[in-house]
Regions:
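Helix-start (N-cap) detector for alpha-helical repeat units in TPR-like alpha-solenoids
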Residues: 22, 56-57, 90-91, 124-125, ...
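Terminal, low-structured helical/coil segments at or just beyond the last alpha-helical repeat
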Residues: 23, 332-373
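Alpha-helical segment of the N-proximal tetratricopeptide repeat
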Residues: 23-52, 61-68, 102, 166, ...
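Structural signature of tandem alpha-helical TPR/SEL1-like repeats
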Residues: 34-43, 47, 68-81, 102-115, ...
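Structural marker of alpha-solenoid helical repeat scaffolds
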Residues: 51, 85, 119, 152-153, ...
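Alpha-helical adaptor scaffolds
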Residues: 234, 261-264, 268-308
Length: 373
């Protein structure tokens, strides 16, 4: 009997030792991470969280390993569990935000990154990622607010300054955009993109002559860069410098013979010069390349009407209206076409629409001109 009891004691002791040997510890998991055995480290952290389900740090560590394995969805679940257990655990919101950001989920990244920045206002990483997430989420005013602070501490970071400048431009904060683009041009005088962005900012401020100078500089630096010559031509067209614009558009076509916008605006210039045959050739080719160019369909309608191809003209004008029903010019042209066809009721309907749209434009303009109440 004594021997039997002794055997039971020894067996119980061995079982206890075996269980202790099989119970993983955080040190085991961290050692596996350092060895690069991420799959084993993940399994170990999962066992630890099962054994100690109230251990926030264990869930946080599991999230880090999962992120290293690019298992971002699972990592986010682990981070959220860690935060639920201990909302004050440092670094978790930042890691959660990074996992969202790396998936391109910019809207979802904003909340945890804002939390990370609130917890550590001196974190350049949290502020930078928050600014970039706002930019990715098209919250441009917010993006510029965060990125402006970061750029001040990293003045030589041209790529980050470009994002800041574009954020300012898209938020219609043109003075900020101009200031940042000037810095970029000074740092990179041979950068075509810097001159283009500066030109866009100046044009946004209705300083088109200065914008043209910037686009000319871009075209000089990179004469075969796609869209640079078109951008220059568009500004020249906008300024009614049609001869210069034609040269720029032709330069774009030398790079891309099917550049739909260059074709459309060359067609517009030919139409304005009453060269309807050439205009028709350009415009028809433009709409073959792209079906969303309102100016091409509007001009096609005008040219076809001049040539008395009324059914085709009507189809083109109706397409222009469908692309943007708020613009009065296509309605006016369609009204004139109905007049030519002797359809007075339809003509009057289109002219009424023209008056309505002009009244809306006048109303908006008058409201914009009023001082704030």
């Amino acid at each position: 009997m004594i021997k039997r009891n002794l055997l039971f004691v020894i067996l119980a002791s061995l079982s206890s030792l075996s269980l202790r040997a099989q119970t993983p510890t955080p040190a085991d998991a961290m050692a596996l991470e350092q060895q690069g055995s991420l799959a084993e480290a993940e399994r170990t952290w999962r066992l630890i969280t099962q054994n100690t389900p109230d251990d926030a740090a264990a869930f946080a560590s599991l999230g880090l390993v999962l992120s290293k394995e690019t298992k971002y969805e699972e990592a986010i679940t682990a981070y959220k569990k860690a935060l639920a257990l201990n909302p004050k655990l440092p670094g978790i919101q930042l890691n959660w935000g990074i996992a969202e950001f790396k998936q391109g989920r910019f809207h979802e990244a904003i909340t945890p990154l804002a939390g990370a920045l609130a917890a550590d206002p001196d974190s350049a990483q949290a502020r930078t990622l928050l600014g970039l997430s706002c930019y990715g989420a098209k919250q441009f005013a917010e993006a510029s607010k965060y990125l402006a602070v970061v750029v001040k501490t990293q003045p030589s970071n041209t790529e980050l300054r470009k994002v800041l400048a574009q954020s300012c431009l898209l938020a219609k904060n043109y003075s900020c955009a101009e200031s940042e683009f000037r810095q970029i041009v000074q740092q990179n005088p041979d950068s075509a993109s810097a001159h283009v962005l500066m030109g866009e900012a100046l044009d946004g401020m209705s300083r088109t002559p200065e914008a043209i100078v910037e686009f000319q500089a871009a075209a000089k630096v990179a004469p075969r860069e796609p869209d640079v010559n078109f951008g220059l031509g568009y500004l020249q067209w906008k300024s009614h410098h049609y001869d210069d614009a034609k040269v720029s558009f032709q330069n774009e076509l030398a790079i891309d013979p099917n550049h739909a916008q260059a074709l459309a605006y060359l067609g517009d210039i030919a139409m304005k010069e009453n060269n309807f045959g050439q205009a028709l050739a350009y415009l028809e080719k433009a709409v073959q390349q792209r079906t969303d160019l309102r100016v091409a369909y509007l001009d096609l309608g005008v040219v076809l009407m001049e040539q008395k191809h009324y059914p085709e003209a009507m189809a083109a004008l109706q397409t222009a209206i469908k692309l943007d029903p708020t613009r009065p010019d296509a309605h006016f042209r369609l009204g004139r076409l109905y007049q030519a066809l002797g359809n007075a009721p339809e003509a009057e309907r289109e002219f009424a629409k023209v008056r309505e749209l002009h009244e809306k434009e006048d109303d908006v303009a008058s409201k914009m001109g009023k001082p704030p109440e």
